[in-house]
Amino acid sequence: MRQNYFLEYVPNAYINLCVDKAKQMANNRFVYDFKAGDKEAVQICAEWLVRYLTKQYSSILEDFVVVFAPCSTQWKYNKRFGYLAAILNVAGIATANEHVHIFGERKPTHNGGSHVVNEDIYHVSVDGEYFKGKQVILFDDLLTSGKTIEDFRSKLEAAGAYVEREIFLARTIHHDPISNRGVLQEMAEGFYEAVAHSKRCFPQGVNINKKSNNNYNKVA
């Protein structure tokens, strides 16, 4: 499965590995703002996504539908991806928000130090008739282990969809994206293997310069 992303996200515990902490912290803040539904952040992400998809698929983009991976609740899903879907639709890119249904709330429970989703209070369903035969491009905000997107992809494929690609706003890494400092430790700790094949959408990367609380100056 092809996986692509726009930004690197470095957890706070590893931020001191970064030679350009200010830049990485700005990238992290952008991810937080997007997840919170900040319209400026969503607008920028939409512009990146439209540009990337148009470049990759050109005239056949109309044959695909962009599907957003489920959040912890339906209202968060609507807030996070509703505006993004509207922008993509204006650009002529189909989305499927109304065909993904989230029931309950995803709450992590501890199991031997790991986090497991309690299926008794959370369930995701998709409209099988709609997705049967559809060519799908999946989008999610953050790629860490890949487990969440893998589970959702399996659900769509079971409904008869063909998932062509997965795209993420950011990929979680536990090393410095500039110097690669810490990458050997990341590999040793098992963080790296599951998503090592993922690639940047734009090889040169993207830079986020935040000018004020709700105003971004974007460079791609």
Q: Where in the sequence are the language-model features?
A:
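PRPP/pyrophosphate-binding module of the type I phosphoribosyltransferase fold
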Residues: 99, 107-208
